[in-house]
Amino acid sequence: MARAANPAPRLLGAAMLLLLLVAAGRRAAGAPVVNELRCQCLQTVQGIHLKNMQSVKVTPPGPHCGQTEVIATLKTGQEVCLNPAAPMVKKIIDKMLNQASSN
C-alpha cells in the first residue's frame, strides 16, 4: 500500500506565508499616504468673479510640481485652477497676504 504524503509541511508553509503577508499589510497601512505626486492644475483660467469664490489655496513649487498652483474653491464646491501670472489672480493673492499680515 502506498502512503499518503504528509500535508503538515505544506500547511505550515502556507500559514507562515499568510502571517508574513498580514504583517506586511498592517505595516503598509500605517505608512503615510502621499496625496499627489504630480501637478493638480493641468489647465488654468485667467480669473473668476470674487463673489463666486469661497476660498483660495496657494501651493508653492515643490517636489510634486515645479510651478505655483492657485486653486479656488467656488461656493458650489467646485475647484478651479487659476493662472498665478494673471493680473486678477495676483490681486487676489496680494489681498490674501494683506489680510493675513493685518491679523
From Swiss-Prot:
Disulfide bonds: C39-C65, C41-C81
GO biological process: immune response; inflammatory response
Keyword Secreted carried by entry: yes
Keywords assigned: Cytokine, Disulfide bond, Growth factor, Inflammatory response, Secreted, Signal
SUPFAM superfamilies, A to Z: Interleukin 8-like chemokines
InterPro entries in the cross-refs: Chemokine_b/g/d (IPR039809), Chemokine_CXC (IPR001089), Chemokine_CXC_CS (IPR018048), Chemokine_IL8-like_dom (IPR001811), CXC_Chemokine_domain (IPR033899), Interleukin_8-like_sf (IPR036048)
A GO cellular component entry from the record: extracellular space
Pfam families: IL8
Superkingdom classification of source: Eukaryota
Chief place of localization: secreted
Stretch forming the signal peptide: 1-30
Protein's cellular compartments: Secreted
Transmembrane region(s): none
Any GO molecular function: growth factor activity
Entry-linked PANTHER family: GROWTH-REGULATED ALPHA PROTEIN, SMALL INDUCIBLE CYTOKINE A
Family, similarity comment: Belongs to the intercrine alpha (chemokine CxC) family.
Summary of the function given for this chain in its UniProt record: Has chemotactic activity for neutrophils.
Protein name: Growth-regulated alpha protein
